[in-house]
């Protein structure tokens, strides 16, 4: 089997960041969708950047240093946006009997559990279309490494419940396979070094 990482594939419900595709002779055998989400910010970091440069003796205009515009993590909008996107895409993957994996940072996952309705999401079920994988940064071997922290899953209705919605993206498996096969380019072939 050959493995490919195919970026930006359009499906009903939007774009999927990546597909991990298992193929043989450039024919799709299996696939999983992968969404990556990092934290967004609100405001601008520019004034803080300018103050840092000033502290290190690098000239910046005084107006930039005195700018009091705040910035920070936009937790609510980031979490809500990705849950809405996952809901739009979940039904497509559910109809195909395939998985869509959301990869997020541990603090964002913890925020989502606290601020949205996640109490119904417990454990991992192979039959669920939507999987959440949260990663943490851990100190190991005198360095920092990513480590899988949490794995849970749900279905389309479960994502809707997270958002407080009452839960159509219909596409045929053959159509997705044809789209993926058209993108099985050598530049996307995954080479594992052991």
Task: Tell what function each PLM region has.
Residues 1-47:
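Active-site metal-binding core of divalent-cation-utilizing nuclease and nuclease-like domains
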Residues 32-37, 50-51, 122-131:
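A signal for specific C-terminal beta-sheet/loop modules enriched in small/flexible residues
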Residues 35-57, 72-75:
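Short beta-strand-loop-alpha-helix junction that forms the active-site gateway
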Residues 60-194:
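Non-catalytic C-terminal interaction segments of nucleic acid-processing enzymes
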